[in-house]
Amino acid sequence: MQAAYEVINERGYAATTFQEIAKRSGLSRPTLNYYFATREDLYHALLQQAHEVVTSCIRIAKQHDATLDRLRAYIDAVVAVWHRDGAVVGFLVNARLESYRHPGLPSATVAATRGFLGELVSEAVVRRELPSHTDQASLVELLYAMLWGMGAYAGWQRRPVDVAVIAKQLQMVIGDGLAPVTDRDR
C-alpha cells in the first residue's frame, strides 16, 4: 500500500500503473492483481485507509470542548500522522485534486473533513465563540482551504519541511484571528 500511495502522489491517479507500483513495492504485477483487480479497486482501498486516518483525527479533535482546542487537536493529529507516514497525508491532499479531475472517484474524506469543520463552526456560533452573524459556509471553506493548503505545501516541497512548525504557525493565525472577534461580540 505504501508504494501505491507514493506512486499516486508522484504521478496522479490517471498516470498510475500497476507496473510502477509492483516495481516500487518489489511485488509482481500478478500478485498486485490478485489483491486488486483494477486500479480503481486499489484506489478505493487506499481511500478507505486514508478515510480511516481522517476519521481518527476527527475523533481525537472531538475529545476537546472549545472550538480552537478542537481545531488545534485536529491539526496536531494530522501532523502526528504526517510524521508517521507522510505519504498518507500527501495522498489525502492529492485525493482532493483527483476528485475534481475524476468526478466519479469517491470523496468521503473531503466530506468528513468539511462535515467536521461545519459542525465545529456551527457549534462555535451556538456557544457564542463566534458571532451569530458569522457566514458559516464561507468560514468552513476558509478553514478547509487553509488546512488543505498547509498539507499541499508540505507535501509538494522538494526539500525538508518542518510540518509541526508550520502547523503551529497556522494555529496561531487561526487563534489570533478568531479570538478577538469572540471577545468583541460578547
Regions from the PLM with identified roles:
Residues 3-8, 78:
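Short hydrophobic clusters on alpha-helical segments that form packing/core surfaces
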Residues 6-41, 45:
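Helix-turn-helix
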Residues 45, 59-88, 136-143, 167, ...:
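Hydrophobic alpha-helical connector segments
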Residues 48-54:
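Short, basic, alpha-helical segments at the C-terminal edge of helix-turn-helix-like DNA-binding modules
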Residues 64, 112-139, 146, 177-185:
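Hydrophobic alpha-helical bundle segments that form small-molecule/ligand-binding pockets
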Residues 75-78, 92-96, 143, 147, ...:
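Short alpha-helical scaffolding segments that buttress acidic/His motifs in well-ordered protein cores
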Residues 77-122, 129:
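Short secondary-structure transition hinges
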Residues 134-153, 165-173:
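Hydrophobic alpha-helical segments that form the core
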